[in-house]
Amino acid sequence: MQEGFHHVAFACRDPEATRHFYEDLLGFALTHTEVEGDEKARMKHLFFDVGDGSSMAFFYLEGPGFPSSYPTDISTGMGLPVWVNHVAFKADADRKRQIKATLSDAGVEPLMTVDHDWCQSLYYLDPNG
């Protein structure tokens, strides 16, 4: 029996900016952090509860053996518009208004809004593109 997914994972450029965006602005609790390695080379893995028993996770890699910088915006690396590959969260109208206001107060404006007839979407870029 299919039960959905446990987590999806993406790369991040700045774990603190990522935490701030998802925990402080969107309200997703940081539920688990794994750190492997040492001061020279390490991997940090952050898990955020997205509200249905699933998590969204981010890897931060630094040190020898890892690139000093890496693209985290999946779509543009494939020559596509930045909004093509994305994650969409469910929210009722009141929650959407609240999130839009919170993000706007933090200086984060939607990339675009789309009425798909069967759902309405607000597209934002997180700190990772």
Stretches with model-predicted labels:
Residues M1-A17, V84-V87, A91:
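N-terminal beta-strand motif that seeds the catalytic metal site of vicinal oxygen chelate
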Residues A11-L61:
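Core segments of cupin and vicinal oxygen chelate
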Residues G4, K44, D52-S54, W83-N85, ...:
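Residues that flank catalytic or metal-binding motifs in active/ligand-binding sites
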Residues G63-R95, I99:
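Helix-adjacent hinge/juxtasegments
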Residues K100-G129:
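Vicinal oxygen chelate
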